From Swiss-Prot:
Enzyme class: ligase
Cofactor annotation remark: Binds 1 Mg(2+) ion per subunit.
Subcellular location, record wording: Cytoplasm
Catalytic activity from the UniProt record: IMP + L-aspartate + GTP = N(6)-(1,2-dicarboxyethyl)-AMP + GDP + phosphate + 2 H(+)
Principal location listed in the UniProt entry: cytoplasm
Active site: D13 (proton acceptor), H41 (proton donor)
Named cofactor requirement(s): Mg(2+)
Family: Belongs to the adenylosuccinate synthetase family.
Protein name: Adenylosuccinate synthetase
EC numbers, comma separated: 6.3.4.4
Function summary: Plays an important role in the de novo pathway of purine nucleotide biosynthesis. Catalyzes the first committed step in the biosynthesis of AMP from IMP.
An example molecular function term from Gene Ontology annotations: adenylosuccinate synthase activity
Protein biosynthesis recorded as keyword: no
Lineage: Bacteria, Bacillati, Bacillota, Bacilli, Bacillales
Organism: Staphylococcus epidermidis (strain ATCC 35984 / DSM 28319 / BCRC 17069 / CCUG 31568 / BM 3577 / RP62A)
Length: 427
């Protein structure tokens, strides 16, 4: 099996969906391995814009399988809404497969997410309140309900009653709140499971069959390395592992199956939610990037925080995800800026450091050390090779590659599929 993993190298929203869609044309199977509908992928082609949250980007290719792996947490009601929306626009979803071992998000997870954020007050994480974190907590506590359980009426009924009893005690003690009732959950979610029944299967077997048949598999990451619960800006992170290594756990394939890891980044940096952000901008350059780049969350609609490109972050992501190739998106967004900056290191308590601190208080004290490069004014949205880019834009990309220690295999100069340029064959 030849396989490629696509991961975000920043705090998510790097354009992974577009790159996955671009690479999916040559793949046989496209599989998601982590996260839930807190993720948001925007894909544009043929003059149409599609916003996905749970459905893998490969859904648009009828002859390829789009897999939701066991490491994904699935809100069945939200998933059906997404599938219905695609069907209404003439997109077939018959090629979708959902792991029977994927955990199910239920209304009490959404309630718990809301209550937890309220309890934290000024120390809130800034979650999307989609129930992702509480679902992963239940998984770790071994009380989670999986897709296989949802499909069996007696199993689902028994497990749901047990969990509601537990959640009621927990909600009362922690938040002075009550859990959604059995009657408020059971019928709707069991019916949702029955509608999804034909999609649910042992997806690890599908991927193993692809391996035996020497097919091409594309693994689609969600969020980004800096949101990884182990390697990100903890505790301002997601509740799963977006790093490439989680492909093995989140889909059931062996670690020797991975051939390449494509690290996706923007030509600048953005993040949604709270937490340290060393290169964050609050000036006119930041306003330019946010408005030209349309930096508003796909899932939440919230304005994203934006900042200059941070090579400290990228080097960290390269190391913990084993990144072999770099895909740089949204280069066109920087057009028109007199000067563009790259963070090369941090200053911490008067000392220069080049590695990302694990301690949050230290990270908050870090000041970015910038290298300034001249900007460009030329329209680059039609450029199809590095040689076609203005010299200043080309120098900017080459400097990023040099600082991060990874060569560039893909660059993008606009939101459409046709504006994504491959510099070398990856399969």
């Amino acid at each position: 099996m030849s396989s490629i993993v696509v991961v975000g190298t920043q705090w998510g929203d790097e354009g992974k969906g577009k790159i996955t869609d671009f690479l999916a044309e040559q793949a046989d199977v496209i599989a998601r391995f982590s996260g839930g509908n807190n993720a948001g992928h925007t894909i544009q082609f043929g003059g149409e814009t599609y916003k996905l949250h749970l459905v893998p980007s490969g859904i648009f290719y009828k002859d390829k399988l789009a897999v939701i792996g066991n490491g994904v947490v699935v809100d069945p009601v939200a998933l059906l809404k997404e599938l219905d929306g695609l069907n209404e626009r003439g997109i077939s979803t018959d090629n979708l497969r959902i792991s029977n071992r994927a955990q199910v998000i239920l209304p009490y997870h959404l309630a718990q997410d809301e209550y937890e954020e309220r309890r934290r007050g000024d120390n809130k994480i800034g979650t999307t309140k989609k129930g992702i974190g509480p679902a992963y907590v239940d998984k770790a506590q071994r009380i989670g309900i999986r897709m296989a359980d949802l499909l069996e009426k007696e199993t689902f009924e028994r497990r749901l009653k047990e969990n509601i009893e537990y959640k009621n005690a927990y909600f009362k003690g922690m938040f002075n709140e009550t859990c959604p009732t059995f009657d408020e959950i059971f019928d709707e979610y069991y019916a949702a499971g029955q509608r999804l029944k034909d999609y649910v299967t042992d997806t690890a077997k599908i991927l193993d069959d692809a391996n035996v048949a020497d097919e091409k598999v594309l693994f689609e990451g969600a969020q980004g390395v800096m949101l990884d619960i182990d390697h990100g800006t903890y505790p301002f992170v997601t509740s799963s592992n977006p790093v490439a290594g989680n492909v093995t756990v989140g889909t059931g394939v062996g670690p020797t199956s991975v051939s390449k890891v494509i690290g996706v980044c923007k030509s600048y940096t953005s993040r949604v939610g709270d937490g340290p952000f060393p290169t964050e901008l609050f000036d006119e350059d930041g306003h330019h990037i946010r408005e030209v780049g349309r930096e508003y969350g796909t899932t939440t609609g919230r304005p994203r925080r934006v900042g200059w490109f941070d090579s400290v972050v990228l080097r960290h992501s390269r190391r913990v995800s084993g990144i072999t190739d770099l895909s740089i998106n949204s280069i066109d967004v920087l057009t028109g800026l007199d000067t563009v900056k790259i963070c090369t290191a941090y200053e911490l308590d008067g000392e220069k450091i080049t590695e990302y601190p694990a301690n949050l208080d230290q990270l908050r004290r870090c000041k970015p050390i910038f290298e300034e490069l001249p900007g460009w004014t030329e329209d680059i949205t039609g450029c199809r090779s590095l040689d076609e880019l203005p010299e200043n834009a080309r120098n900017y990309l080459e400097r990023i590659s040099e600082l991060c220690g990874v060569h560039i295999s893909i660059f993008s100069v606009g939101p459409d599929r046709e504006q994504t340029n491959l510099l070398e064959q990856l399969w």
